[in-house]
C-alpha cells in the first residue's frame, strides 16, 4: 500500500482541483474548487466546451453584457462541478463570488441560484456544497441556507473564533487552512527549524478537532491548503483532507505506513456545549489573531481578483 491508500483508510480524501483529468486519475471521494482553480482551468484551454456552453447559456438568458458575464461565470463554476461529479461518489464544493463575503443576503441569493443551476442540469443537489468565506456574514448565510436544505463549506478559516462561530451555527463543513497558517509564521521566521508537530497550522487544526469532538459538534472538519506531506501525515484521522494534485502524487509514491494521529475514540466527551459567541465576541476574538485577520483578508482579495479576471475574460468572449 502507498501512503495515499493508507490515508484513505482513516480520512476521507478530497481533491482540491478544477482539473478533471487528474480527478479521474486519483479517484477521490469528494472534490473542491475555488475561483483561482476555476480560472486556471479556464485559461488552460482544456475545457473550452464548458466555457462555450456557459457563454451560450448566458446569451440565451439575455440581459445586458454585465448580466451575461455574471450568468456565464456562475454557469462555468457549475459546469466544472457537473463534470467533476461524474467521476467522484461524494460532494463537490462550489465557491460563490468572494466579493459577496460581507453581505449575508447576497450570499444566500447567490447560493440559491447556483443550486438551481445544478438542479436544472439534473444534478442531485444533496451532493453540492456551497463554499463561503468564514466571515460572520457568511456564517450567518450558511445557517440560513441549511434551514432550506442547502449545505455549506466554510472556507478561509484561520482563527479559533471562526471555528467556534461555525460550530455554533451548525454549518455542515469547515476548511481550516493549515498551509496558509504555516505560510504566515514562515514569513516572520517563527517556525524554524521545521517540525510537523509544532507546525502552527497543524496545531490550529488539532485544537479545532479536539474542541468539536469533545463537545459533540456535528460540523465536519476538512483540513486544507497543505504545503508539506508532513502536515498531512500529522493529521491522519481528520474527518476530511483536501489535497493538491502535487501532494496527492507524492503520497501515492510513498510506501511508508501512515499512523492515525487524530482519534475520536480517545477524546473524553462533554455533554454541555459552551455558550454561542455573539457577533461582537466573534469580531473581537478574531481580531485578536493577527495571522487570521491578515490571511482572511488576503484570501478574500485573491479570490475576488481571480473572479474579476474570469469576468474580464468572459466580457471579451461575449
From Swiss-Prot:
Record keywords: Cytoplasm, Pentose shunt, Schiff base, Transferase
Residues annotated as catalytic: 131
A cellular component term, taken from the record's GO annotations: cytosol
EC number: 2.2.1.2
Annotated Gene3D superfamilies: Aldolase class I
GO biological process per UniProt: carbohydrate metabolic process; pentose-phosphate shunt
UniProt xrefs under Pfam families: TAL_FSA
Alphabetical list of InterPro entries matching this protein: Aldolase_TIM (IPR013785), TAL/FSA (IPR001585), Transaldolase_1 (IPR004730), Transaldolase_AS (IPR018225)
Subunit relationships: Homodimer.
Function (record text): Transaldolase is important for the balance of metabolites in the pentose-phosphate pathway.
UniProt name for this protein: Transaldolase
Amino acid at each position: 500500500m502507498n501512503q495515499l491508500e493508507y490515508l484513505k483508510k482513516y480520512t476521507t480524501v478530497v481533491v482540491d482541483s478544477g482539473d478533471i483529468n487528474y480527478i479521474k486519475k486519483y479517484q477521490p471521494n469528494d472534490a473542491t474548487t475555488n475561483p483561482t482553480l476555476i480560472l486556471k482551468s479556464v485559461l488552460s484551454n482544456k475545457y473550452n466546451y464548458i466555457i462555450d456552453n456557459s457563454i451560450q447559456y448566458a446569451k440565451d438568458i439575455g440581459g445586458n453584457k454585465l448580466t451575461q458575464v455574471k450568468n456565464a461565470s456562475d454557469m462555468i463554476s457549475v459546469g466544472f462541478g457537473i463534470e467533476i461529479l461524474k467521476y467522484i461518489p461524494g460532494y463537490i464544493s462550489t465557491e460563490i463570488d468572494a466579493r459577496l463575503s460581507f453581505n449575508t443576503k447576497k450570499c444566500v441569493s447567490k447560493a440559491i441560484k447556483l443550486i438551481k443551476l445544478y438542479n436544472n442540469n439534473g444534478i442531485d443537489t444533496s451532493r453540492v456544497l456551497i463554499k463561503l468565506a468564514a466571515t460572520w456574514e457568511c456564517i450567518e448565510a450558511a445557517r440560513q441556507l441549511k434551514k432550506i436544505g442547502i449545505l455549506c463549506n466554510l472556507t478561509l478559516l484561520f482563527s479559533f473564533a471562526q471555528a467556534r462561530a461555525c460550530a455554533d451555527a451548525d454549518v455542515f463543513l469547515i476548511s481550516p487552512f493549515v498551509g496558509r497558517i504555516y505560510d504566515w509564521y514562515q514569513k516572520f521566521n517563527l517556525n524554524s527549524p521545521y517540525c510537523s508537530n509544532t507546525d502552527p497550522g497543524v496545531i490550529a487544526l488539532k485544537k479545532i478537532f479536539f474542541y468539536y469532538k469533545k463537545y459533540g459538534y456535528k460540523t465536519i472538519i476538512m483540513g486544507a491548503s497543505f504545503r508539506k506531506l508532513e502536515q498531512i501525515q500529522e493529521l491522519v484521522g481528520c474527518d476530511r483532507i483536501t489535497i493538491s494534485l502535487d501532494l496527492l502524487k507524492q503520497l501515492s509514491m510513498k510506501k511508508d505506513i501512515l499512523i492515525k494521529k487524530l482519534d475520536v475514540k480517545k477524546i473524553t466527551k462533554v455533554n454541555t456545549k459552551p455558550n454561542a459567541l455573539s457577533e461582537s465576541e466573534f469580531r473581537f476574538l478574531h481580531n485578536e489573531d493577527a495571522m487570521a485577520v491578515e490571511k482572511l483578508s488576503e484570501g478574500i482579495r485573491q479570490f475576488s481578483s481571480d473572479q474579476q479576471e474570469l469576468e474580464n475574460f468572459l466580457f471579451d468572449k461575449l
